[in-house]
């Protein structure tokens, strides 16, 4: 932990949030047990990662209760402090959010990973209506909104625990406010309070089972197939090459959302595992796909397109992999999305600095395998994170190509707002690094109802029945996780 003198020196350099860090051994705990001890209340989060579908990432992140958060819907933003609105803004929320983020000047913590606090949460799909290059083409008609969640919700994370899964250590991070005369002392006291919480045992919420329920499609199979045929008509007319329609499923779910996260992380380990407690609703997900990642001046997108079910045996798994890589439709769709990714990254990157670093590799998850590629660029001077978001949002894999025309068709054919689905979840650090996953393989739990949404890439030779089945396959991990909870994880 830095000394009072070091703290004062950093304040003199103009930093208005200064991290105090305490390192402890926590090798007898897991990220889940630590979350139960330190957080497990509204406006907290747990972020984990599984690399390559088979090993946990080095770091996990627990956000302690956030006193400040922003909610944006349409052209209005509310800033909350301890549950009360303290600031409001009318107009495009994105410049306001960027200005809010930029209020905080913090020194880096060299011994820790790149994320050590900042804005954490999501940008829902309807964020598209705030980008000027989309707004003039999209109608933004009023649609049914069964979830009723904000378009954007971001927490200001100033107290967190960074878990090093390799060493078994936990780094407690509390940001002090040097504008407060006793800011340093208050942060030290808060660290001691958190240490006390760590020493205490926590009640383990057992999952003993509940009533079994079935998921019901909002769209319905036959209307969805008709939607696929309508999109194919647009494709044959030359309007577009691909569109990704989606359908939402819902089921009664009265169990703990944290139990759902336990089941999902076991069933479908993914690069982005996340649990967000927003009070009146929860987001639980295991997304395999980056929307965009910024690390200093490098930007990365990683398109995923092309899907097969996992095989029941290694031989069947290999056969499915070979079948996927020899499927002309899937390959053509994937190449189109690589080109779209190159175009998106190219808009914000220096000339000649865009490259495909992985091309059409197979990544395997619990229920499905995908074709994946990696596109990287070096940012032009002066690019902001909102410039990056504008260039890459929404993902081509969730919209289609050309992107704007595909989004117009989605607006026409889907019966309700997408909400969180198809948007982005993740972190925007104080250091301006950003890591956002696409909100897929993701459940929203609200009012004892679980919602999960999934899409299928429709091209000229798509079979409507196959595209319907693809939406079922992609939702399967979340629905099966919910059923595992209903059967009882701890029976």
Swiss-Prot record:
It comes from the Bacteria. Its cofactor is Mg(2+). Keywords: Amino-acid biosynthesis, Aromatic amino acid biosynthesis, Lyase, Magnesium, Metal-binding, Tryptophan biosynthesis. One of its GO terms (biological process) is L-tryptophan biosynthetic process. One of its GO terms (molecular function) is anthranilate synthase activity. Gene3D superfamilies: Anthranilate synthase (3.60.120.10). Its EC number is 4.1.3.27. InterPro entries: ADC_synthase (IPR005801), Anth_synth_I-like (IPR019999), Anth_synth_I_N (IPR006805), Anth_synth_I_PabB (IPR005256), Chorismate_C (IPR015890). It catalyses: chorismate + L-glutamine = anthranilate + pyruvate + L-glutamate + H(+). Binds 1 Mg(2+) ion per subunit. Feedback inhibited by tryptophan. Chorismate binds at residues 306-307, 421, 441, 455-457. PANTHER family: AMINOBENZOATE/ANTHRANILATE SYNTHASE, ISOCHORISMATE SYNTHASE MENF. Part of a heterotetrameric complex that catalyzes the two-step biosynthesis of anthranilate, an intermediate in the biosynthesis of L-tryptophan. In the first step, the glutamine-binding beta subunit (TrpG) of anthranilate synthase (AS) provides the glutamine amidotransferase activity which generates ammonia as a substrate that, along with chorismate, is used in the second step, catalyzed by the large alpha subunit of AS (TrpE) to produce anthranilate. In the absence of TrpG, TrpE can synthesize anthranilate directly from chorismate and high concentrations of ammonia. Heterotetramer consisting of two non-identical subunits: a beta subunit (TrpG) and a large alpha subunit (TrpE). Belongs to the anthranilate synthase component I family. This is Anthranilate synthase component 1.
């Amino acid at each position: 932990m830095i000394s009072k003198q070091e703290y004062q020196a950093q304040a003199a350099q103009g930093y208005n949030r200064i991290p105090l860090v305490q390192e402890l051994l926590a090798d007898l705990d897991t990220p889940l047990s630590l979350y139960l001890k330190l957080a497990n209340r509204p406006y907290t989060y747990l972020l984990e990662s599984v690399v390559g579908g088979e090993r946990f990432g080095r770091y996990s992140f627990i956000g302690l209760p956030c006193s400040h958060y922003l909610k944006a819907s349409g052209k209005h933003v509310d800033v909350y402090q301890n549950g009360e609105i303290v600031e409001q803004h009318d107009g495009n929320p994105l410049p306001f959010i960027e200005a809010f983020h930029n209020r905080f000047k913090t020194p880096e913590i060299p011994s820790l990973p790149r994320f050590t606090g900042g804005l954490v949460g999501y940008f829902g799909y309807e964020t598209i209506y705030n980008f000027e290059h989309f707004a003039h083409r999209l109608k933004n008609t009023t649609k049914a909104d069964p979830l009723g969640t904000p378009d954007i919700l971001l927490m200001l994370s100033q107290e967190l625990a960074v878990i090093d899964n390799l060493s078994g250590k936990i780094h407690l991070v509390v940001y002090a406010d040097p504008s407060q005369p006793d800011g340093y002392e208050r942060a030290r006291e808060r660290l001691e309070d958190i240490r006390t919480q760590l020493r205490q045992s926590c009640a383990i919420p057992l999952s003993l089972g509940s009533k079994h329920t079935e998921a019901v499609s909002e769209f319905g199979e036959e209307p969805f197939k008709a939607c696929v045929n309508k999109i194919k008509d647009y494709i044959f007319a030359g309007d577009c090459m691909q569109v990704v329609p989606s359908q939402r499923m819902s089921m009664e779910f009265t169990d703990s959302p944290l139990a759902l996260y336990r089941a999902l992380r076991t069933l479908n380990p993914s690069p982005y595992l996340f649990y967000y407690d927003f009070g009146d609703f929860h987001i639980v997900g295991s997304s395999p796909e980056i929307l965009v990642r910024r690390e200093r001046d490098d930007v990365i997108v990683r398109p995923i397109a092309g899907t097969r079910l996992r095989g029941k045996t290694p031989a069947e798994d290999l056969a499915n992999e070979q079948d996927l890589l020899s499927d002309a439709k899937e390959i053509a769709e994937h190449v189109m999305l690589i080109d779209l990714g190159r175009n998106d990254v190219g808009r914000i990157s220096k000339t000649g600095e865009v490259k495909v670093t992985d091309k059409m590799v197979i990544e395997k998850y619990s229920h499905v395998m995908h074709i994946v590629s990696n596109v990287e660029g070096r940012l032009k001077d002066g690019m902001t994170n909102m410039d990056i978001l504008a260039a890459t949002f929404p993902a081509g894999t969730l919209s289609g190509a050309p992107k704007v025309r595909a989004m117009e068709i989605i607006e026409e054919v889907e019966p309700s707002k997408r909400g969180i689905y198809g948007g982005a979840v993740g972190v925007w650090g104080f250091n301006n690094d950003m890591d956002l996953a696409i909100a897929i393989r993701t459940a929203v739990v609200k009012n004892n109802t679980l919602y999960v949404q999934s899409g299928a890439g429709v091209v000229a030779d798509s079979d409507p029945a196959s595209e319907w089945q693809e939406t079922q396959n992609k939702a399967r991990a979340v629905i099966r996780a919910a059923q595992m909870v209903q059967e009882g994880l701890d029976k």
